[in-house]
């Protein structure tokens, strides 16, 4: 019988702010904001060379978050500079995803800093998993992911879907911003949970304090969360000031979605696109099986040129040669024994 496979920074350099009058001092926050003005002026005067078509130039044009806990920001800047190999490696890893993420952030008129959040969450590792079960670029917990429409099955994990998870994360962040009215508090809630932040706000208000990020009693991870993001923002904003060089990433799509009408082997899809299987999986990490099964909320993503190649080859291909598995879609709950009986496995 034929066997049937069944798919059941120490900062040096320029100074652009006036010296204080005799006896005048600056607060740490004023110093932090002065550093941001330094970055902006350096950009305006061409100190940072970046083409207009660079994704970094577009990000810099929409950085807008004020600094919080400047002493922590400075500390994380120094750490990233001293670990420059890690910083460069992580930024390079963002290459396939940065345009898409930054473009989606810009469409929603969100601060450009949000596009750098996966640096903190996952280091742009699409299948990163935390010890508590969060997973993906945006580190969704299973329940939160499902709440924001990310399907999770034995065959597919939407938390690893680049497009779907980015959309879900931005929806979640916009909800949190609407709830708290402040991006630093929204980010704190993304990390710590909205209930925890709400309770911390009430405790601060009961103590007569303004409900700001700096005034909330938070765990160390959340206390450092936004300062760490702002440190990454500052390094991206003015890499030369920190002795760094960012990889050139064009402000244009790296990938696009293609439509398929029937299941096909992942290796066949890669072959039709003239790319390696590893290149295919880098953009489609949500799939846990060797078959791509089209569904309304799932997309196949391919590098732009490869997408054109795929579509041309897909139109000319024989569908029978693209799938080496039998795909069984049950219409109701079924036991493994019954499934084996029905499929002859």
Regions picked out by a protein language model, each given a short descriptive name:
Residues 3-7, 19-109, 114:
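An acidic, Gly/Ser/Thr/Pro-rich helix-cap/linker signature
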Residues 6-14:
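Sec-dependent N-terminal signal peptides
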Residues 75-88, 124-131, 139-181, 201-216:
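Substrate-binding clefts and substrate-entry loops adjacent to catalytic sites
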Residues 283-316, 344-345:
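Extracellular LysM carbohydrate-binding repeats and other cell-envelope/extracellular binding modules
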């Amino acid at each position: 019988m034929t066997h049937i496979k069944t798919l059941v920074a120490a900062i040096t350099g320029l100074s652009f702010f006036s010296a204080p009058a005799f006896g005048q001092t600056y607060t740490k926050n004023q110093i932090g904001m002065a550093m941001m003005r330094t970055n902006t002026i350096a950009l305006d005067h061409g100190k940072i060379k970046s083409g207009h078509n660079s994704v970094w130039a577009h990000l810099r044009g929409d950085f807008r978050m004020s600094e919080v806990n400047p002493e922590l920001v400075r500390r994380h800047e120094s750490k990233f500079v001293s670990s420059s190999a890690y910083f460069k490696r992580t930024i390079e890893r963002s290459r396939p995803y940065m345009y898409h993420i930054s473009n989606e952030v810009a469409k929603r008129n969100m601060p450009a800093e949000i596009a750098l959040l996966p640096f903190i969450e996952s280091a742009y590792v699409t299948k990163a998993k935390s010890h508590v079960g969060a997973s993906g670029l945006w580190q969704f917990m299973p329940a939160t992911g499902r709440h924001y429409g990310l399907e999770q099955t034995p065959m597919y994990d939407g938390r690893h879907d680049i497009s779907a998870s980015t959309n879900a994360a931005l929806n979640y962040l916009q909800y949190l911003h609407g709830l708290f009215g402040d991006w630093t508090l929204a980010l704190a809630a993304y990390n710590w949970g909205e209930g925890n932040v709400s309770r911390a706000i009430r405790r601060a208000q009961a103590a007569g304090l303004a409900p700001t990020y700096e005034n909330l009693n938070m765990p160390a991870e959340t206390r450092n969360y936004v300062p760490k993001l702002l440190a990454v923002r500052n390094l991206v904003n003015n890499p030369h000031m920190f002795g760094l060089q960012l990889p050139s990433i064009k402000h244009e799509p790296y990938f696009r979605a293609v439509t398929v009408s029937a299941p096909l082997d992942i290796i066949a899809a890669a072959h039709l696109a003239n790319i390696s299987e590893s290149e295919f999986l880098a953009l489609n990490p949500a799939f846990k099986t060797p078959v791509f099964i089209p569904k309304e909320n799932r997309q196949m993503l391919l590098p732009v040129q490869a997408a054109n190649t795929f579509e041309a080859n897909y139109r000319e291909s024989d569908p029978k040669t693209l799938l080496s598995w039998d795909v069984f879609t049950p219409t109701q709950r079924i036991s493994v024994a019954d499934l084996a009986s029905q499929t002859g496995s």
